[in-house]
């Protein structure tokens, strides 16, 4: 373990929830790839990783299970989804509009919907980052990718 290596080397989603639509699965795969490629992930009070993050939903709560590369348990954090639920629902509604617009709307209409989609995604990312601030230090881009994965879990769960 390299002291100060505050990075994720692996992200695992709860597979008991099952698979979703091809669009959602694509978003999941891209978010995991991007998150592993470039992230800042620092469990508060831990000397360093790299880390494996397992995400799951248990009783409508988001569970972050963090281990080191050697399998050593680092922490398990459980968050209520209540503060994120409205943002996630709004995000899914605008994503549906976005995918419909891609098939039938003008480029300017698609761009307007996409700007709204990104704005809602940013709100969700910041909310997640704020909820984790005393547990895990994240940069905003890592929080964005994690929010995408939370949405995938929520959609499938």
From Swiss-Prot:
It holds the Pfam family UPF0262. Coiled coil: none annotated. Disulfide bonds: none annotated. InterPro entries: UCP032146 (IPR008321). Belongs to the UPF0262 family. HAMAP family: UPF0262. This is UPF0262 protein Avi_0642. It comes from Allorhizobium ampelinum (strain ATCC BAA-846 / DSM 112012 / S4).
